[in-house]
Every structure is written in C-alpha cells, then in structure tokens.
Amino acid sequence: HAEIYVQESSDRAFEEEVMLSGFANADVKAEGQGISYDEAQETFTARYTNETIALAFAITEEAIEDNLYDRIASRYTKALARSMSNAKEVKAVNPLINGLPSGSFKTGDAVTLFSTQHPTIAGVFSNTLATAADLNETSMEQALIDIAAMTDERGLKIAAKGMKMIIPSNTQFTAERLFKSQGRVGTADNDINAVKSMGMIPQGYRVNNFLTDTDAWYIITDVPNGMKMFNRAPLTTAMEGDFDTGNV
C-alpha cells in the first residue's frame, strides 16, 4: 500500500477534506478599468472513516503447563502479524479493484474512482481511458496523453505527468518489456521506445500481488492530494489471561 497512498495521521473517528474549485483564467485588465473578481467554490467533501482491525489467538492453560508456550507463541505471533498485514493490503487495493466504472467504490464527487464523467464546475473530466484496454504500447501512450490533458475544476490545464505504474503480477513481464526495451515492443520497425527515451513514468512500475484483476493497470500522477491513507493508531499487541479458562 505504501506505493499507492500518501499516508497521513489521524486523531478522530473520521477525516474530511473539502474540495475547492480555485479560480478561472485571469483576464486582461483594460487601462482605468476595475479588476475582475472571481469566487472559489466548495465542490464536494471527501470523508475518510477510520476502522479498527483486530485479531487474537489463545493458548490453553494446559499447553503452558506443558512448557509449549514459547514454541507455540512464536509461531502464532508471526502468523498473526501476517494476517494483520494481509488485511491492510487487501483493504488498500479495494478502491482500485472496485473503483472501475462498473464497480461500487465511489469518491467524494459521487462517481466511481475511475470514470470518464467526474463532474467539475467547468464540465466533466476523465481519469481513465475512454475505451478500456490491456497494458500495451498504444494504451500506455494514450494514457500519458490523457494525463497531460487533465484540467482542474475550472478547466485550467495542470500539466500533470505520470510518475509510477501499479500492476498485478500477471502483467509484470509486459511492463518490463515496455519500460526497459530500447526499441518498440513487438514490432520489426526500427523505432525507439518513446516512453523510455522521453523518461516518462520516471518511477517505473510496482507489482502489487493483492490486485485481483489480472489485466488492470494504474498510473499514479504528480497531481497533489491524490490517494491518501490515514493511520489513527499504529499496530499494537497485548496479552491477557482468561479468568474462566486460564487460557492466555
């Protein structure tokens, strides 16, 4: 999840962020005329609700009496840590898996995370390909073209750039060829690999083994205030005895 989200701290049950529209393009002021005024607007509110993740195991009183505690506890503790880590990773990829146009994960603007119809004051904008496509040279180049054309809430160009690609393990070999080949992939043409030559997506690709869509791929841009993850309390462990059973 660290490759997807910017992590911030939290000290409450939920966090809210209000999206501001910014201003329209500045106008030329004629000599002697007054300055034109514009108003920034609140467009939508995004809420991040904290959740408590917990899991426990018990060792019987009899196992402790048989001097099995150290042997069992060490193995169980490692397994518990793996379970907690897995839960975090599964939750982290949920927006990516269910944020597709046919999915159920919606953002603060009431549409799915990946949509061609994100509403703005200036109209709509898209953060996904107009026609879904597997990862290849054509689709990756089109995605970078679309990213460069992104606008803000008021329709102003923001000169966004793709920084990093997130992919499932099934696509890693395709990604390696697309990112590392000097020439174009899968063609006899003596052309350079434009993405590599131009230094686009400078952070390369990262494989996320928790993605369940085997042909999905995502590009993280340099646009600020993107994917965020709040951490209210770090992972802690505790040991308590059960009065009724004597288990620990």
Regions found by a protein language model. Name each.
Residues 101, 105, 153-158:
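Surface-exposed acidic, glycine-flexible loop patches that form ligand/cofactor-binding
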Residues 1-53:
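Assembly/oligomerization interface modules of large self-assembling protein complexes
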Residues 67-75, 82-146:
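Alpha-helical scaffold segments that mediate packing/assembly in large oligomeric complexes
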Residues 3-6, 157-163:
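Short coil/turn segments at secondary-structure boundaries
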Residues 45, 60-64, 85, 92, ...:
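An acidic- and aromatic-residue-enriched active-site/binding cleft used to recognize and process polar
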Residues 13-18, 22, 43, 47, ...:
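Short, charged/polar micro-motifs that form catalytic or ligand-binding hotspots
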Residues 51-66, 121-124, 159-164:
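Glycine-rich, often proline-containing surface loops adjacent to acidic residues and nearby aromatics
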Residues 112-152, 159-164, 170-248:
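Sequence/fold signature of self-assembling virion shell proteins
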